[in-house]
Design a protein with these regions (language model features):
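Intrinsically disordered, Ser/Thr-rich regulatory regions of eukaryotic membrane-trafficking proteins
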Residues: 1-602
Length: 602
């Protein structure tokens, strides 16, 4: 029997909004349900689990979690059950994400974190969309399948980073020129001026061109688009891509370039131009200022609701002021709106907000419980209007459909221009660069992974694990190195060395200022009262968070963060590993073909 795993999302009424689980989980749950008398014996071997059965079995633990949160402000992060089964919890916009598995705790927590990120990309703050629109829940399932598959097979995805294929300058210029011409031709044909064209090969970043007015494409959004492209091509209905006219189009909400995600509406078109070679077009649609302020309003309203439930009134005034500011930004963004449906929805929103505002102000002035109860009731209607406004201003099926034909033509332009180098870049992606030429300078070194956590770009020699013999470095050992190091990083350890019978392993994370001068933190990364989030990029930038913790008086934008993982054969002294690490970091631009510079990725 396989390992059991499942993901469930519950709303505030403990109803199931979404479920994704494997057959082992279904079999186990149905057997329990028959024992409990909530499922007839003849349904014991069904291939699905009814929602009412899940609610019956999980309501006690979900309710307990909500009580721990609301009454004590001290929710569970995980529960270990008899037999090794683990249940992990996470929360987003009042929805409870529950992950169940028999594997390592960090892996289940990471899966929950990725699930929240994917839900935000697909639905923004309105998680209920997963129940209301089956297309969304199906796409979420496909994305999670792709992530799980890539996590097990792609080192960069495991690290939530981007691997860039290194091309010589002349080749790079001709690729960018081809992408530029495709974007320029698109701008003249469709009603959109903010466009990115990204070329990806075997889930690796090859090149990007962005139109002048487009917002910078963040590493988070690039990584998401790679997983989306992988999911699209794997799940194509014909199973055998005809690259002459295949296109996959999606409406998503990207994070944007700022440190906290903003849910910016984009149409994404993925066009395969050869096997494992995709052009991804990003069309920025709608009003980004409105989308950002709408998302902020959802976030601050959710915080207000949490404060009310937890009765933590000492922080209510600043939370209310944040909500008021976010609503003002929404109103300002809609001043020039000419759409009748949006205008009608906005008027309703303003009316409800004015009533809410009076009640919150009344409560803050004289702590009147009745005023707070009334504000809470009004907030429910206000939330529904917010959802409607979000849908009206971010969904634009028209541009998604009308731009498809032009995008296919633009992709053909690129495909023709790059025809002579397609095979070369595919081979280059498989063997980006080899460690062989550096073995003399770094005796004993068999593998390293260097990650610039400003651009989230990873530099690492290519290894064909299929060719390796079991006694040499295996994929399992490299994956364990990464998981082990990140588990300790979450606990606050930024330097680590350990060994097994064959290899010595090392992990270091450090900070530099913009001049490359090392920075030493005087603030400990963790304390007994605070746990760090799961290391990663897609849900929230963990590395941004630790910059803020370690250097509270410095702007995070002035701090650069790096990590390096090293594997040496045999026993190696600590000074040798440290010296190799320093020299590797200093010469990494030679390996990657360009200096480490935050703007290089773009």
């Amino acid at each position: 029997m396989g390992t059991m795993n499942g993901l469930m999302i519950f709303d505030h009424l403990n109803d199931i909004v979404y479920i994704k689980c494997n057959n082992t989980f279904i079999k186990h749950i149905n057997e329990l349900a028959v024992e409990d008398g909530v499922l007839p014996e003849e349904n014991k071997h069904d291939t699905s689990v009814p929602d009412n059965v899940l609610v019956h079995l999980f309501s006690p633990v979900v309710t307990s979690q909500r009580i721990m949160t609301s009454q004590f402000g001290n929710s569970y992060s995980s529960i270990q059950c008899y037999g090794g089964l683990k249940i992990c919890f996470d929360e987003f916009m009042g929805y409870l994400f529950v992950g169940i598995g028999e594997g390592e705790l960090l892996k289940i927590q990471k899966y929950l974190s990725i699930s929240i990120a994917m839900v935000r990309f697909l639905c923004g703050p309105d998680v209920y969309e997963l129940k209301a629109r089956s297309q969304r829940s199906e796409l979420l399932s496909n994305l999670l399948d792709s992530y799980n598959d890539l996590r097990e097979n792609d080192q960069a995805v495991l690290l939530e980073a981007i691997e860039q294929v290194v091309l010589n300058p002349n080749l790079n210029t001709s690729v960018i020129q081809a992408l530029k011409e495709s974007v320029v031709s698109l701008i003249t044909q469709i009603d959109c001026f903010k466009i990115h064209a990204l070329l990806a090969v075997k889930n690796k970043f090859l090149s990007l061109y962005s139109s002048e007015l487009a917002k910078e494409l963040s590493p988070t959004d690039i990584l998401f688009s790679m997983i989306l492209a992988d999911s699209a091509t794997k799940n194509s209905s014909d199973g055998n891509l005809n690259t002459s006219n295949s296109i996959f189009s999606y409406q998503v909400l990207l994070s944007g370039p700022e440190s906290s995600p903003k849910c910016l509406p984009h149409a994404i078109h993925i066009v395969p131009i050869d096997e494992e070679l995709n052009i991804i077009f990003f069309l920025e649609i709608g009003n980004s200022a409105l989308s950002s302020s709408l998302y902020e309003t959802f976030c601050h309203l959710h915080i207000m609701q949490q404060i009310t439930v937890q009765r933590d009134f000492s922080v209510m005034r600043p939370a209310y002021e944040n909500l008021e500011l976010a609503v003002k930004k929404v109103n300002d963004s809609l001043k020039k709106n000419k759409n009748a449906a949006i205008d009608a929805c906005h008027k309703n929103l303003v009316k409800k907000w004015d009533s809410m505002k009076k009640k919150y102000t009344e409560f803050l002035k004289n702590s009147a419980e009745e005023a707070l109860l009334r504000a809470e009731t009004l907030a429910l209607g206000f939330l529904e209007d917010l959802k409607q406004l979000l849908h009206l201003t971010t969904v634009n099926e028209g541009i998604l459909k009308s731009s498809r034909k032009n995008v296919i033509e633009a992709a053909k332009l690129v495909s023709e221009k790059l025809n002579s180098i397609k095979d070369f870049v595919k081979v280059k992606a498989m063997k980006n660069f080899s460690l062989a030429s550096y073995l003399e300078d770094f005796p004993g070194l068999v593998h390293f992974i260097y990650v610039d956590r400003t651009t989230h770009r990873v530099t690492s020699p290519s290894i064909n694990f299929q060719m390796e013999k079991p006694h040499l470095l295996t994929k399992r050992k490299v994956w364990h190195l990464i998981d082990f190091a990140l588990q300790h990083l979450q606990e606050g350890t930024m330097s680590l060395m350990w060994k097994d019978t064959i290899f010595s392993y090392a992990y270091f994370l450090w900070f530099e200022d913009s001049n490359g001068t090392p920075l030493k933190s005087t603030v400990p990364l963790t304390n007994p009262n605070k746990t760090l989030p799961v290391p990663g990029l897609l849900n929230n930038d963990f590395y941004q968070k630790i910059k803020e913790i370690c250097f509270p008086k410095m702007s995070p934008s002035k701090i650069r963060c790096y990590e390096i993982f090293c594997v040496h054969l045999g026993l190696v002294s600590q000074p040798c590993v440290l010296e190799h690490t320093r020299r590797l970091a200093a010469t990494i631009w030679e390996l990657s073909g360009h200096p480490s510079h935050p703007m290089d990725l773009i």
